A protein has these predicted regions:
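Conserved beta-strand termini and adjacent loop/short-helix elements that scaffold enzyme active sites
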Residues: 6, 35-37, 83, 116
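FMN-binding flavodoxin-like domain, especially the glycine-rich phosphate-binding loop
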Residues: 16, 24, 28, 56-186
């Protein structure tokens, strides 16, 4: 099964989430391609798509929204998972889903949408964004919950390869029957 993981990220934090998800899917024995949304020319070779975007002011990055618009008909015929990254703080705020997420789930027939907390590193953003985040007292830091992200990746893998075919081994998932490294067990 061929899976596309495509992520729109402004500062790299959301892209890192996509890379972790792609790695989990590969470890489950799936063929995974990663690409920026604007670089994808077609979906003919993919059976499933994981589409993610950073969220700024409650909105997805333009290239992710454009991807969803451009390939809406193709996405509606595939297994699709959506995720957003952007709420920050402890607890992450805002707590509500990005406004367009539920509409996208419905329009694309996506299996699910998940929101994950993000990261704010003021050294990586522009002067205007820095001023706004300071004025709004937005906390700086990395608030991503890697355990929750990996668990969701495991769920996607199980959906694609079958729940009885995926087992956790040494912190990664492998297709059942895969050989364990020397000294390991499945």
């Amino acid at each position: 099964m061929n899976v596309l993981v495509t992520v729109a990220s402004k500062q790299g934090a959301t892209e890192e989430i996509g890379q972790v998800l792609a790695g989990i899917l590969r470890d489950a024995g799936l063929s995974v391609t990663t690409s920026a949304p604007e670089a994808v020319s077609g979906l003919d070779t993919f059976d499933a798509v994981v589409l993610g975007s950073a969220v700024y002011a409650g909105r997805w990055v333009g290239s992710a929204s454009a991807f969803a618009d451009r390939f809406a008909a193709d996405l509606a015929r595939r297994e699709v998972w959506l995720f957003s990254s952007g709420p920050i703080g402890d607890p992450p705020l805002p707590t509500e889903e990005p406004p367009a997420a539920s509409a996208l789930v419905e329009r694309l027939g996506a299996r699910e949408h998940r929101s994950f907390a993000g990261r704010l590193d003021r050294d990586r953003i522009g002067l205007m964004e820095r001023a706004v985040t300071r004025a709004l007292k937005v906390p700086e830091g990395d608030f991503r919950d890697w355990e929750a992200i990996r668990a969701w990746g495991d769920e996607i893998a199980a959906d694609l390869v079958g729940p009885t075919k995926v087992v956790r081994m040494f912190g990664t998932i492998r297709a059942a029957g895969a050989t364990a490294p020397q000294g390991g067990t499945t």
